[in-house]
Amino acid sequence: MLQLAEYVAETLDIGPGTRVFEVDCGRGEFLFPLHQNGYIVGGIDGDADAIKDAIAAMPGGLFQVGMASALDPAVPWDVIVCRSLAAAPSNDYIRGLVARMYAKATHAIALIDVPDAQHQPLVHAITEAGAQAIQIEGAHIFARV
């Protein structure tokens, strides 16, 4: 996960002190290397045990139990990451989630490991949310706010 975290940080030109929030963060495997390097991390996941593990592994991280569909855009973070779009139930769900992610982000969003079939709906959803700078690198989609 270290290489992926470094790749995302480099692609988005972010460094220590940046606030990175992950949707469906699980135990925080993606966020852990960022936390170790001085990033402020947080996330949301529906699995309470996974969130307990994330809190134990990353003291000071801001984690909460909840579904991605309940993501609150009122609390801003610099970067919002999602690695779970392969499990998205529909394009409407994707559109709503991307809109909330984009509204929550102050710098960028990163959609990681996106299946090919979801590229077009995601790019459309990101454009609807207001992004004008979208970068696609293989299975990853980045959008600046």
Where are these regions (language model features)?
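A conserved beta-strand element that flanks and buttresses the S-adenosyl-L-methionine
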Residues: 81
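Conserved beta-strand signature within the Rossmann-like core of class I S-adenosyl-L-methionine
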Residues: 106-114
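Conserved SAM-binding loop
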Residues: 54
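A short, conserved alpha-helix within the catalytic core of class I
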Residues: 88-100
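Conserved SAM/SAH-binding beta-strand->alpha-helix loop
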Residues: 47
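Conserved SAM-binding strand-loop segment of SAM-dependent methyltransferases
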Residues: 59-69
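Conserved alpha-helix/loop element of class I SAM-dependent methyltransferases that forms part
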Residues: 1-16
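Conserved SAM-binding loop of SAM-dependent methyltransferases across substrates and taxa
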Residues: 27-37
